[in-house]
């Protein structure tokens, strides 16, 4: 039997087979209202039974950036070439794992996922080998939500995580743009 992150994370989190698939994305209306109506309507295509995406990305100009909303994450860069100094890189720690937990994307397996995340936080600076292994498991779960061969397959949960992450990062950028220049956006 071959083992990879798909089988390891799936087997670790589930004991009773596949998780339940969602029939629609699970994002509160109030969160969807934080983006432009055109972006919101693009994302709501995910609730159509045929699940055929007519629009794949929408680009908006805001705070000096071309910001691309889509189904693979939020991406943004300055609209024109710029020269900058004193650059700071900010990273949202365990963003997708925390969204997976918040949305309960794994159903009953979410509690095991929480245990893995808590264990990783506990040993992050004490045991690099175990910490990196747990990080690999945590991060592979998001991809497995959209992997048809995984017991974790739940495409609308994957898209819910992705959309939620885009809204959260977009909101963070809007708030930061009052006090700094945004030069790169990437979920």
What are these regions (language model features)?
Residues 1-87, 92-98, 175-187:
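Conserved "right-hand" nucleotidyltransferase catalytic core of DNA-directed polymerases
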Residues 82-187:
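Conserved catalytic core of nucleic-acid polymerases
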């Amino acid at each position: 039997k071959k083992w990879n992150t798909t089988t390891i994370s799936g087997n670790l989190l589930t004991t009773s087979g596949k998780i339940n698939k969602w029939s629609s994305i699970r994002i509160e209306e109030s969160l969807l209202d934080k983006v432009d109506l055109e972006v919101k309507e693009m994302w709501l295509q995910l609730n159509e039974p045929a699940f055929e995406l007519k629009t794949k990305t929408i680009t908006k100009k805001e705070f000096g950036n071309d910001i691309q909303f889509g189904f693979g994450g939020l991406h943004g860069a300055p609209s024109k070439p710029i020269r900058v100094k004193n650059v700071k890189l900010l990273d949202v720690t365990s963003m997708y794992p925390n969204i997976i937990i918040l949305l309960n994307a794994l159903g009953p397996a979410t509690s095991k996922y929480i245990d893995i995340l808590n264990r990783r936080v506990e040993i992050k600076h004490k045991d690099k080998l175990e910490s990196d292994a747990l990080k690999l498991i945590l991060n592979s779960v998001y991809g497995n939500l959209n992997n048809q061969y995984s017991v974790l397959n739940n495409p609308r949960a994957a898209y819910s995580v992705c959309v939620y992450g885009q809204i959260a990062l977009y909101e963070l950028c809007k708030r930061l743009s009052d006090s700094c220049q945004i030069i790169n956006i990437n979920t």
